[in-house]
Amino acid sequence: MLTCNDKINPKTLLEEIMALRPWRKGPFEISQIKIDSEWDSSIKWDLVKNATLLKDKVVADVGCNNGYYLFKMLEHGPKSLVGFDPGVLVKKQFEFLAPFFDKEKKIIYESLGVEDLHEKYPNAFDVIFCLGVLYHRKSPLEALKALYHALKIKGELVLDTLIIDSPLDIALCPKKTYAKMKNVYFIPSVSALKGWCERVGFENFEILSVLKTTPKEQRKTDFILGQSLEDFLDETDHSKTLEGYDAPLRGYFKMLKPSKR
């Protein structure tokens, strides 16, 4: 949990926090008020925080949401940090949080998507984190290309995406929704994802972890509006989504932009 002990009027603070719902990423604690977010993002952070060194590196978080991972990255001493997310509400959440967790104003927050990277930030970053974005893209290869071109030579990409459990080079293309999400287009097998990444130009594809999403990591709280993971799964068989697909399985990966291609 990210904690700040600044003394603030608790009633006013809580009103501001609740006005910014839903809180997807967190948790945070400000002046003893805990923002109990839908996702316990510390679980994902613990899986990727040691994937590569961030000290003195130029680092990006693509799909940064309210900045939870950016604030955690600050603890590792990067040279600079840039977050990218086109969402309006999540930027407002970041602007609310930053005075507590980025007091030196080291983080740059860009209201841009992955598709804007290669034009605005070509060959710019030593490390890019892209967590939970790829399956929302209608063209995952184009998204991977954008990430590739935004990296410096020998730069590293740390990627998290939904995957399917299959040895084949295939991807699931949900008909209408996946776990009630309308904006999920391609969920690859690990083998298919590796092929996509290699076609774009990445090398040294490494599996960091593969984990099922559980209610410990994603669940309904007072700080979100609406439903969460358990509402998206089959009531009688939690190994399946409501649509009958396999329940969410996530893969965490690291790869390198080589010096020559």
UniProtKB/Swiss-Prot annotation:
Keywords: Transferase, tRNA processing. The keyword Protein transport does not apply. It catalyses: carboxy-S-adenosyl-L-methionine + 5-hydroxyuridine(34) in tRNA = 5-carboxymethoxyuridine(34) in tRNA + S-adenosyl-L-homocysteine + H(+). Carboxy-S-adenosyl-L-methionine binds at K25, W39, K44, G63, V114, E115, Y135, R250. One of its GO terms (molecular function) is transferase activity, transferring alkyl or aryl (other than methyl) groups. Its EC number is 2.5.1.-. Homotetramer. HAMAP family: tRNA_carboxymethyltr_CmoB. Catalyzes carboxymethyl transfer from carboxy-S-adenosyl-L-methionine (Cx-SAM) to 5-hydroxyuridine (ho5U) to form 5-carboxymethoxyuridine (cmo5U) at position 34 in tRNAs. This is tRNA U34 carboxymethyltransferase. It comes from Helicobacter pylori (strain HPAG1). The gene is cmoB.
